Amino acid sequence: MLVAGTGAAVHADGFTAAGLAAHRALAAAGSARVTAALVFAGARHDDDDYAGVLRGVARTIPGAVVTGCSATGVLTAGEEIENASAVAVLALGGDQPLPPPLFRLGVRDDSRAAGARLGREALAALDGDARGAVLAILIDPGELDAADFVSGIADAAPDLVITGAGASGGAKGSRVFMNGAAYPDACVGLLFPAALHPTVGMTQGCQGLTDPMTITAAEGNLILEIEGRSPIDILEQALSEPRNRGLGQITGHLLAGIGDIVSVGRSDYVVRPFAVAEADPRALAVAEPVRAGQTIRFTLRDAIGARDDMKAMLDEQAEAHNDAPARFGVYFNCAGRGSALYGKPGLDPELIRRRFGQLPVIGIESSFEIAPACGQSRIHMFTGVLLLAG
C-alpha cells in the first residue's frame, strides 16, 4: 500500500524551511519507509539556497529520491502560501514504490525532439503499455516551446495522459530539482502507472461570456470569420448584451476560449489571449494557430464562476475514485489564481479539503499548466489541474 504525507514551512533560510517541511511530511506519512519526496521551493531562495533546500530534505528523509521545482508560492490541503520563502514537501512510501523519475537537460533548443525522447523513456519504463498511466512533468518555462514539448511526448507515447506545469521563479528564472541539484533548461517527469488509478481534473479560471461559436474561416493565428460573420461584429454584439454591458472598457482582460466542435463536458477548451489583427481590423489574432471548424467563446476571469467550476471538477474527481480512493494529490495552480483571482489565498485548497478531507495534497503556483482538453494534452493558463493517485 502506498502512503503519503505533506508538510510546509516558511523561513528565509532554505535549509531550515526544507527541514521543517520534510519533518512534517515524514510525520504525516507515518512509520512506513519513505522512498520519494516531491519538493516545491519558494523562488526567493537563490541557486545556493536551492541546494540548501535539497540538503535539508535529504538529511530529514535519507534515501528518498528527491525531485521538484521552484515556485513563487506553494500549497497543501491546509493552506496556500503566497510567499517565495515557503517550501512544501510530499513524502511517498510504502510497499508500492513509484517508477524512477525521468530527467532531461536541454529542453529548449529542439523542444519537440526533447519531448519525444522523454516520451520514449516513459513508454519503456511502462514496458510499452501506457494505457491508464499518467506522466506529470515539471519543466523550466524559460525560452521553451511548451506546446511542442508536450506534442513530442504525445508523438512517442500516444496513450499516455500528460499533466504537470511550468515551474515559476524570480529574477534568476526557474529551476527543476533532481539528484540534489537545481537545474535550468530541464524537465523532470513523474510516472504514475495504471495500478495507482491516476486521474487528472482541470478547472478553468476564465468563464464564458458567450456560448461556443464555430470558426468558419481562419489563416494561421487569424480568425477571419465566426459563423460567417466578422469576429469584431460578433465581439461587439456579445459586449452589447445587457449582462455584459460595461465590459467594453476592459476588453484587454477578455480571452478567447478555443475548443472543437466535438468538445463535450465542462470547461473543454483552452484559454488564449487575443487582439484585433493589425493587418486586418475585422479579424482577431489569437496566440496560437487556429483552423476552421474549431469553436471560440469569449471568456473573462471570474472568481464566482471559477469557484463553481472548481467544485464541479472536484465532484468529478471524487466520482472517479469511488472504487479506488486516492491516497495523495498534486495540484498545479496557475499563479493568476489564488489571491489574484479570488482576492485572498487559500480558496482552492479549502475546496479540496472540504471534498477530500485530510487527503495529502501538495501544489505550486505555476507559470502554465498541462492537462487534457479537446482530446489531447494541452498547455493551459488560469487553470487549476488536480492529479489524484494511489
Question: What would you call each of these model-derived segments?
Answer:
Residues 1-58, 63-342, 346-359, 364-390:
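Small-residue-enriched flexible segments
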